[in-house]
Amino acid sequence: MFNLVTRGQAVANQALTSSVFIIVTIVAITLARLYQDNVWSIDTTSIGAISPSASIKYSFNYGSTNRQPKENAKIQFDLDADLTSLFNWNTKQVFVYVTAEYPGKSDGSSNRVTFWDKIIVSKEDAKLHLVNQRSKYSVWDVEKSFRGREAVVRLEWNIQPHIGPLIFGETEATATFNFAEIEKKKKKKEQKVEKVEPVVEEIKEEVKEEVKEEPIPEPVQQAQQAQEVEEEPVQEPLDEVPIQ
Amino acid sequence: MNIRQQLTQFLSLAYVFTSAFVIWKSLGIITNSHSPIVVVLSGSMEPAFQRGDILFLWNRDQEAKVGDIVVYEIQGRNIPIVHRVLREHHNSDKQLLLTKGDNNAVDDLGLYAKKQKYLNQKTDLVGSVKAYLPKLGYVTILITENVYFKYGMLGLMCISTLLTNE
Amino acid sequence: MSSNKKVNLNSVADLRQNTDDNLPAALEGLGYEESFKLVDTKIALGLSTVAIAGGLFAIDKKYDFKESYWITVAALAVYFVISLVMLVVNNQNKNVKYIGYSSKGKKITIAAWTTKYDPIYHVKVTFNDDPKSTTTAELPFAKFFDLTGYFSRNAFSKLLSSHIEKIEKKDI
């Protein structure tokens, strides 16, 4: 230990080994604590009073391709949850989100969407009591419409630690609802699409995963057929065998 | 000087670089990701991730789950983006994802390529974030953004190897 | 051969390194000719790992991850195999600093090491790879480094040869 370089190296080596050891210990303690607090089976939650609503959107930002009608869904819900057991000294933040899982068209296909999420930073804010909470996001499916399918709603959480692995889980509470269906009188709105100028967008080679719309009512179909000639072959819906 | 001595000295210096590189490549193969350790560069995932945090990725999951934090790159652009999966749709062949940064008001639709509505889980993802170290990556931000720092560090490494005989 | 330079008497590592460097000269004086087979093997293995790493680097620059995946796996596998071989070679020749042959064809292997803070040069001399004809000697650095830090070849050669002759006599 007679010169700076050797001393520096020795210190660095020691620092490295000790920090690895410390981190491993921290992670082990955190996980043990979480197991102890039974966080993977939080049953002090309830979700209910889900009232779904649906609307038709035509903008790309709401899932529409080429200004075709796209069904968007939102829900309102009540939520009670006590997530205080997720907070320990190694918890930096907890991300909670309300998801809805519903089936797709073919066997083995499934979808899961987030309607609402929230970042909880401290233990004091970890008790949630929401009444008639509006969903944060307007949700659309890969298909053109939700077809009134049944969805299972869950409250899921994600612990972001100060150091270590990200931890995920879901609470025991579940609820179900059926997606709202658009009333038939909306047909008038769909007919208007015929008069809209076909928007020819640049087809680049990297176009990915274009989802073909479901068979749509007659009047609009003709307009769309005119458009389709100019487009690249559109890919099949997710639940059928993809072309490429 | 003796050529054998010179070669031996060269080898001990080269060893530092070759072993570091081999470890990096092995990590990439094990995790199936071309960049298994990333440093957070933007604030779009705050307060979870800050600039300078180190993320450890894993890319051998069959499917991503809603709520997972993933790193993806849009085809044709080399910028990795770290965001959370907001929605997923899958069948037995593939999975499509929609992502959003926690600190952003809207989802990532505007970040994708033109006309791209979803990410493909198999081809667009660099990996999903499994673990996290705070702030230590700031050194690499300094190295990439501050030229003097980079060469200073390299120089220090070389000197320290040449001077050690233990 | 390194020209005589002042060695830091407080660094056991420096003392040992300097003595190692002077071994070939000392043994030449005792009638041995150095064999470079081990050194060359180590260098060759080392260079091949550098070559592989270099190749990997070039591939990494040129091709993207998915394309180069299996080549990378293969190259890494070869790298680790060679590293393993190097590990074994080094283990079997632990601390060997000199291998030479006498005019009569007798092989001498000299291993030398130091413990971290003791200024003692441990020397293990083996003849003809025979574990029975091995002697280990402890040569304090003080005996062949003078007060100012200069290496004394005469003192070292004398000290070394006295130990070697002990075994030589035993052999014959």
Curated annotation (Swiss-Prot), chain B:
Similarity annotation: Belongs to the peptidase S26B family.
GO cellular component, as recorded: signal peptidase complex
State its Enzyme Commission number(s).
3.4.21.89
Q: Give residue ranges on the Lumenal side.
A: 31-166
- According to the record, the residues making up region (C-terminal short (CTS) helix) are 152-163
Quaternary assembly: Component of the signal peptidase complex (SPC) composed of a catalytic subunit SEC11 and three accessory subunits SPC1, SPC2 and SPC3. The complex induces a local thinning of the ER membrane which is used to measure the length of the signal peptide (SP) h-region of protein substrates. This ensures the selectivity of the complex towards h-regions shorter than 18-20 amino acids. SPC associates with the translocon complex.
Q: Which GO terms describe its biological process?
A: protein targeting to ER; signal peptide processing
Which stretches of this protein does UniProt put in the Cytoplasmic compartment? 1-9
- Pfam name, any one: Peptidase_S24
Which gene carries the instructions for this protein?
Answer: SEC11
The molecular function terms in GO held by this entry are:
serine-type endopeptidase activity
User: Know the name of this protein?
Assistant: Signal peptidase complex catalytic subunit SEC11
InterPro entries, per database record: LexA/Signal_pep-like_sf, Pept_S26A_signal_pept_1_Ser-AS, Peptidase_S24_S26A/B/C, Peptidase_S26, Peptidase_S26B
| Keywords, in A-Z order | Endoplasmic reticulum, Hydrolase, Membrane, Protease, Signal-anchor, Transmembrane, Transmembrane helix
Membrane topology term: Single-pass type II membrane protein
Q: What is known of its domains?
A: The C-terminal short (CTS) helix is essential for catalytic activity. It may be accommodated as a transmembrane helix in the thinned membrane environment of the complex, similarly to the signal peptide in the complex substrates.
Known function:
Catalytic component of the signal peptidase complex (SPC) which catalyzes the cleavage of N-terminal signal sequences from nascent proteins as they are translocated into the lumen of the endoplasmic reticulum. Specifically cleaves N-terminal signal peptides that contain a hydrophobic alpha-helix (h-region) shorter than 18-20 amino acids.
What general EC class does the enzyme of this chain belong to?
hydrolase
Major location (coarse): endoplasmic reticulum
The UniProt catalytic activity note for this protein reads: Cleavage of hydrophobic, N-terminal signal or leader sequences from secreted and periplasmic proteins
Q: Where is the active site?
A: 44 (charge relay system), 83 (charge relay system), 108 (charge relay system)
Entry-linked NCBIfam families = sigpep_I_arch (TIGR02228)
Q: Which residues cross the membrane?
A: 10-30
Originating species: Scheffersomyces stipitis (strain ATCC 58785 / CBS 6054 / NBRC 10063 / NRRL Y-11545)
Task: Name its cellular compartments.
Answer: Endoplasmic reticulum membrane
